[in-house]
A protein has these predicted regions:
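Conserved glycine-rich cofactor-binding loop
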Residues: 14-15
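Conserved glycine-rich Rossmann-like NAD(P)H-binding loop of the short-chain dehydrogenase/reductase
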Residues: 30-44
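Substrate-binding pocket helix/loop in short-chain dehydrogenase/reductase
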Residues: 98-99, 106-111, 204
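Active-site helix of classical SDR
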Residues: 122, 158, 166
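Alpha-helical segment proximal to the catalytic Tyr-Lys
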Residues: 127, 171-175, 232
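C-terminal substrate-recognition "lid" of short-chain dehydrogenase/reductases
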Residues: 134, 178, 212-241
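Residue(s) in the substrate-gating loop at a strand-loop-helix junction
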Residues: 142
Length: 246
């Protein structure tokens, strides 16, 4: 399969939405390069889920906030695999607090990991894709980047920045037949949302018309479609998976 399958990379594939995208993409026939930074054991679990279901892939480790590390590892991947078919830029963190309560490090860490990673991960992979005149780029943002959330000024800024960057990049790459789209998940059942206390969860659920959290697989199914040949005329879009929250 690996010789024939289209090859993609998914950052933040060790859990949550990233894991779901990696697993579902493998089921759809893609060779999936699963990125992780610190969570090697969890990334190995993702790869195991892929291989036990008949898929193929590999692991790669780098810090998405470290530009030099990204370039070195991604250049090596290109040398090994050639131009990738798809890039799913998904890795992200939160450091929630009121605006006045945020520290400079809280701000910088979220911007570096969530927004700078868009440049750090995608730019080294774009030129090989452009030479092939084909490919798919998906950036995972958040409804927080569309509507803004209390206590998430840094996170909302980073996710809004992703939307703007993806829209601009889509225009630049359209003539090369590379689509660039953004997925904006709402409240999804992940480790990140599991940390929210029960009282806060009840309040959040009241704001969602569908009155439930989404599942990572519901985001993944959209990502797999956007990776496909069938999505060749869809670009520069922001698609929310949020149960109608905005």
């Amino acid at each position: 399969m690996a010789d024939e399958a289209k090859k993609i990379i998914v950052t933040g594939a060790s859990g949550g939405i990233g894991r779901a995208i990696a697993v579902e993409a493998a089921k759809a026939g893609y060779y999936v390069i699963c990125h992780y930074n610190h969570g090697k054991e969890k990334a190995e679990e993702t790869l195991s889920l892929i291989t036990t279901s008949g898929g193929e892939g590999e692991l790669v480790q780098f810090n998405v906030a470290d530009r030099a590390d990204c370039k070195a590892k991604l250049d090596s991947l290109t040398e090994k695999h050639g131009a990738l078919w798809g890039v799913v830029s998904n890795a992200g963190i939160t450091r929630d607090n009121t605006f006045v309560g945020l520290t400079g490090e809280d701000w910088d860490a979220v911007i570096r990991t969530n927004l700078d990673s868009f440049f750090n991960v995608i730019q080294p992979l774009v030129m090989p894709m452009a030479r092939k005149k084909k490919g798919r780029i998906i950036a995972v943002s958040s409804v927080s980047g569309i509507m803004g959330n209390r206590g998430q000024t840094n996170y909302s800024a980073s996710k809004a920045g992703i939307i703007g960057a993806a829209k601009a990049l889509a225009v630049e790459l359209a003539s090369r037949h590379i689509t660039v789209n953004t997925i904006a998940p709402g409240v999804i059942e992940t480790d990140m949302t599991a940390a929210i206390n029960e009282e806060a969860k009840k309040i959040i659920m009241q704001t969602i018309p569908m009155a439930r959290a989404g599942k990572p697989e519901e985001v993944a199914s959209l990502a797999v479609f956007l990776l496909s040949e069938s999505a060749s005329y869809i670009t520069r879009q922001v698609i929310a998976v949020d149960g109608g929250i905005h």
